[in-house]
Amino acid sequence: MDKLSLMHLEGLPIKGDSVFCDITMQDESLKITETSGIFKKKAKNTFSLDLNKIISMDIINEKNIQEKQKSIVGRGIAGAVLFGPAGAIVGGLSGTGKKQKIKTKNVFVISYYGKDNEVKSINFDPGLVIAFVEEFIRDYEDKCGKNQQVNEHGEIEL
């Protein structure tokens, strides 16, 4: 899977709600194109992110944030530093004290080093195509050698 079309949530200088972006993996960069139109897509703005600046790509939700907070490595990853505003989006779901069924909100997060090496994130709504997003993440990890082995203690094996 080398191309996705997802709704932008936060992280790019895009105005408006419900704006879709095409995300394309190229040889050395990730190309994100803001689009307009439904049947006849029109490119508006294009953003390029070097693959070597990407820290991680992940789908987060309330459950896997809690799992990551239990591990040594995950405490740092699950924080707002890495996930930025997406942590607040998903964290809000866990703030209810009532025992009611809550629809899980998934967020596709691309964390990367910006200018001056500050950690930033771009967040998208994977919607109903979550399986395609998972495949896109696997392809990125295979391409960039980012498959990390984590042992039973939550430590990354080097």
Residue ranges and their predicted role:
Residues 1-47:
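Anionic N-terminal interaction surfaces
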Residues 1-7, 12, 51, 78-86, ...:
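Generic detector of solvent-exposed, compositionally biased contiguous segments
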Residues 2, 17, 22, 27, ...:
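Acidic-enriched, low-complexity/disordered segments with a strong bias for Aspartate over Glutamate
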Residues 30, 46-65:
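Phosphoinositide-dependent membrane-docking surfaces
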Residues 40-52, 118-127:
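Short amphipathic beta-strand/extended segments with alternating polar/hydrophobic composition
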Residues 57-158:
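Acidic, Ser/Thr- and proline-rich intrinsically disordered linker/docking segments
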